[in-house]
Amino acid sequence: MSEQDLVVDARGTKCPVPVIEVARASRDLPPGSVLVLLADDVAARSDVPAWARMRGHAVAVGDADADGVTTYRVVLGAGQADRST
């Protein structure tokens, strides 16, 4: 993480809160901004990448740490939007 990354801490929340929180945080940020999501909800492992694809963002999903917290690094506007849905 860099000093400029916006960190969204959704630890302890359940689906759909992690995706809602990262979507809310992304609203006012320009393309190229980086959001780092911390979440321990297992559903976020599929929900966050799906949301990112639909919105045209790139996402890197890290491995869960010993406490079950996964780090998601979302780069806004750096992916291809999924127009199939």
Predicted regions and their residues:
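A general secondary-structure signal for short beta-strands and their flanking turns/coil
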Residues: E3, G32, D67-V69
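Amphipathic, hydrophobic secondary-structure cores in small proteins
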Residues: A10-G62
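Right-handed parallel beta-helix/beta-solenoid
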Residues: M1-D9
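C-terminal structural segments of small proteins and small subunits
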Residues: P49-T85
